[in-house]
Regions:
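Conserved beta-strand hairpin/beta-sheet module of binuclear metal-dependent hydrolase folds
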Residues: 1-45, 126-136
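Core dinuclear metal-dependent hydrolase active-site scaffold
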Residues: 3-6, 16-17, 102-128
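Short, acidic/turn-prone active-site loops that include or flank metal/cofactor-
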Residues: 8, 81-83, 139-140
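A generic "binding-loop/recognition-motif" signal
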Residues: 11, 34, 58, 82, ...
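Active-site HxH/HxHxD metal-binding segment of metal-dependent hydrolases
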Residues: 26, 33-110, 188-194
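Active-site neighborhood of phospho(di)ester-bond hydrolases with catalytic His/Asp-centered motifs
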Residues: 29, 50-57, 76-80, 116-119, ...
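Metallo-beta-lactamase
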Residues: 91, 111-116, 121-198
Length: 198
């Protein structure tokens, strides 16, 4: 997988551009801000944007979706559970497809499995692509997503983190904010992945 990371906006949300080697298409994950910058990056890579994948619906992850989708006509995927809180999206959340636990997406030459990981929001998902986990705001390096915002659920994120800890092997962890990590490091040193603290 070819990958570029763009920390964008005031909250430095990580937007990821990814594609399989040799593919003429790419995907964006969580384009929260700066749509013109992201569109320019797609052009610089000489790719066609096939889809936007959203890990959840907070503004810092979805703010750039509408203009990017309008410009490119790309598909936009979000977990169906995120759409059950309409007041959060009074300005209209643009999407074309919903995903659920266990769905497998084939985009830009990549195969991505959807893992429903509620807690930060009811519809948070991670995307597992080979040895890489796009963890959104569920798992960060050394910590986890907050649960004190509307729709947050402390017990749910506990279960989601334990589920991620139980995934097989080591994985590269690419979170919604902050530095990349690995699942082995998070299992060992992230206090929120230690079952005993709950």
């Amino acid at each position: 997988m070819e990958l570029k990371t763009f920390p964008i906006g005031s909250l430095q949300t990580n937007c990821y551009m990814a594609w399989a080697e040799g593919s003429e298409k790419c995907i964006l994950i969580d384009p929260g801000y700066e749509p013109e910058l992201l569109l320019e990056q797609v052009r610089l890579q000489r790719k066609t944007l096939e889809a936007i994948l959203l890990t959840h619906g907070h503004f810092d992850h979805v703010g750039g979706v509408k203009p990017i989708a309008a410009e490119t006509g790309c598909k936009v995927y979000i977990c169906a559970e995120e759409l059950k809180q309409p007041l959060r999206y009074s300005d209209g959340l643009h999407y074309t497809h919903t995903v659920a636990e266990g769905d497998v997406l084939h985009l830009a030459g990549l195969t991505l499995q959807v893992l429903h990981t509620p807690g930060h929001t009811p519809g948070c998902v991670c995307y597992l692509c080979g040895d890489t986990l796009f963890s959104g705001d569920t798992l960060f390096a050394g910590t986890c997503g907050r649960t004190d915002l509307p729709g947050g659920d402390f017990k749910a994120i506990q279960a989601s983190l334990q589920r991620l800890a139980a995934l097989e092997g080591d994985l590269k962890v690419l979170p919604g904010h902050g530095m990349a990590s690995s699942l082995d490091i998070e299992r060992r040193y992230n206090p929120y992945m230690q079952e005993r603290i709950w």
